[in-house]
Amino acid sequence: MGEIKNTAPTSDISTSGFIYFAVVFLIIIVYLFFKNILFLFFFKRYPKNTPKIGVSNITTIAMIIAVAVSVVLVLMALAGGLTAALFRGYPGFRVTLELILVKISGLLFGPIIGIFSAATIDFLTVIFSGGVFNIGYVLGAILTGMIAGILREVLISTSFLNNKTLSDFAYLVLSVGMVFASFLVTQFFVISVTQNLSAFQSNDQIVLRFNASPLNFSISLQRYVQIIFYFAMVVIITMVVLYFVWIIKQKHFNYAYSKFFFRRYKHANHQFTLFVLTKENWFYLILNVITLATTSLLMINIAFIPIFDTQTTGQTYDFWLLVRLLFAPLIFLLDIIVIYPILLLLTPIMLKGFKTVASETQTKGIKKSFSDMQSLIMPNVISHKKQQLIRKEMQQLAKTIRIDLSDKEVDALVEEFKEITKSFNKVTKIDTTNVQPMYAPFEFSPTPLRKDKPVVDKHAKQLLNNCCEVKTGFVKV
């Protein structure tokens, strides 16, 4: 039975890390290159991989860098020197905290800004905390920023698809592909480095040993890889389940081409109400966070960082592999808990970047994203309460937002808006003559929001007679 022995010098381990960085970096560059070629071929445009430089974007990047550095400094101050000693003795823990906000920067602003912010965060943290500088940790942060930026590129790429249902499915497939690819890369690299560091024979079984009193245990390399595989499969299954929940929840409540979201429900005061929702984006946010947390955990925290932990601490490579595996659930949950609410708050910045990328090569007067399709259509829908939008208008509106649609897609788009306008027409025809206008809670509602009595407007009769011309924009009250 073979056991890992650190017979190879530390320089050999770091060489493996540099090779790993070079290979992953090259793969990302090749991906971006071919993606740009495909966009030129299919969409007749060249997408930028960085957002438009402006005061707001620069301020946000600087804020993320400052917050990442301050988190480390605050922890050092609160722990009374304990955290400082931990970060200096085991700098890999400091890097793990840094990487959380590096991911946010890359996801918001793309791989190029992700590289810059990652290197800046690591340098500043080392300077202000007095920690140990290691080029491997800088490279790990850079890879994390690039991986997060690739996720942003994937989301932008799928948003160019005309059919929303196809766009959602394409994003799921690409996200699942990234998770599975990260597992394959991690498996290959961990096995290769471990075999190189051990007196490996083809018939031997490599054993990883953890010796840190009072906890001592060992695990075979094969079992180690199986645990990583099971984790990746659980994540993939979770992503697929979320996709089906998204599809079921949106069933009969969305249009594939116009990308309208609406919801109908019965109420005592009227037959039904149609809501147009433009912020139903929880699926993309959750999938973003899960994919990013999984890929960075496997490719960076498990496959890459342990190499340089060995350099800075003197512990064996198998020791750090097992330490990272033990802390993997905590790191994964911490990523989701921290990144998701931050992305929820910064989503407008992210969507602003999508608008810039999606419209940069369009005419100068038109800078709209797919979400702006709704803001263009809504005034037309309201103004055509008793008319159907004609085909020519649909074509013009579609061309202002996206690439030219095929005749079949234009026909589908026209049919969708015919149905939408019919829904509005039904609302305008509702007879509310005998319905008393009031503020919430509704007097006849089966589930009132409050128990207090409704307040009736002084000019109720006038409101009833002019319920279709309310200046606030509502069709009916």
From Swiss-Prot:
State the annotated membrane topology for this chain.
Answer: Multi-pass membrane protein
Residues crossing the lipid bilayer are: 23-43, 61-81, 108-128, 131-151, 171-191, 228-248, 285-305, 326-346
Swiss-Prot/TrEMBL keywords: Cell membrane, Membrane, Transmembrane, Transmembrane helix
Instruction: State whether keyword Manganese applies.
Output: no
Source domain of life is Bacteria
Among InterPro entries, the record links this protein to: Asp/Glu-ADT_sf_sub_c, GatC
Q: Which family does it belong to?
A: In the C-terminal section; belongs to the GatC family.
Query: What's the protein called, per UniProt?
Result: Uncharacterized protein MG098
